[in-house]
Amino acid sequence: MARATSGRRLGGLLALLMSGLLLLGAASGSAVGDERLGPRRHMLALTNSDRTHHHRATLSFAERLAAYAKSHSEAMANQGYIYHSTGAQLREALEGYKWELGGENVGVGASLESLEDAFMASEPHRKNILRRVYDHAAVGIARADDRIWVTVIFYG
């Protein structure tokens, strides 16, 4: 699922882009990513690879914001379904950051690679990944029942 929200409009979201559950089968590659990078940074590396392929600047990792993304992924895993943060939750999480637009991709799958592939195959997710205004991202990952739950928050 993908979502974008504006820092200039406290009243709501610029876009709520819902594209359904991402329940993915197994894919090639490591289930939790390149252990040298750690799974969060590996997910960002996959996203940055897609951005580079489409002539976009790479995103910097937002470490402090990643704690919020992780807690959201853990909450989804505990509840057993994917859902977005509310606009108010995203605005609060982004408080203290310099941003004009923020977005969120959430999903669950067998591997980070399969999640990134699914995000790129989904127009709303793809738009979040490739949006030129974004220059930072935070990744939160939880594991439950042999599945990986991911929250990626973009801002710029």
Question: Which residue stretches match the model-derived regions?
Answer:
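Functional surface patches built around histidine and acidic residues
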Residues: 2-156
